[in-house]
Amino acid sequence: MNTKEIECRFLEIDVEALKKRLAEVGAKDEGELLLDEAIIYDPELKWRDEERFLRIRKSGDKSTTLTYKEHSTHTVDGTYELELNIDYFEKAKLLFEKIGLPFFRHNQKRRHKFKLDGVTIDIDTWPMIPTYVELEGESEEALKKVAEMLDLDWKDADFHNARWMIENKYNIPVSTFRHFTFEKCE
C-alpha cells in the first residue's frame, strides 16, 4: 500500500487547450464530478498549523472516502495520505462530531478526471481561483513524462498543497473559512 502521494500542479491553465491535448494523446476521459468535502481538524486547530487533516469526500454519487493527509514538505512526494472507502458522508461527519472532532470547513470543487499512462490528471475548479491541473502517479518520472506529453513545462510545476496555494498564491484565507463552496465563501 503506497501512502506517499506523488503529485504536482500546474496553475492557471488554458482548460480548453489542455482538454484538446488530452484527446490528442489518447487520455481516457473519466468524467466530471462535483466533490463535496468536510475538512476536520483537532479541536485546538494544531493540525491546521501542522498541515494535516481528516477529509470526508463525496464524489458526486459515485463514492465517499475518508482520508488522513499530512503535508511534511512542499515537494513532489511530500504528502502522506491514508484513504479508505466509506458508505455514508453524513453519518461519517456525525461520527466525528460525536467523538469531539466536528467538521471545520465545507469545501467544494469540480473535478474533470483523465487517465494517461498510469497517471491521473485532474482538472480542478475551486471557487474564487483559476482552474489548475493536478498530476498524480507512481513516480516523479511518470509525472514528468505525462507533463511533457501535455506540453506542460516541468519548471512550472507547483508542489504545494491546495490550501497553501489558495492562501499564499491567491491571498484567500481559506483556513479560516467555514465554507469554501460555489454558493458561499466565508
Model regions and ranges:
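N-terminal strand-loop-strand beta-hairpin
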Residues: M1-T120, K155-E186
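Long, well-ordered alpha-helical scaffolding segments within enzyme catalytic domains
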Residues: K144-K155
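A contiguous pocket-lining binding segment that forms or flanks enzyme active sites
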Residues: D124-I129
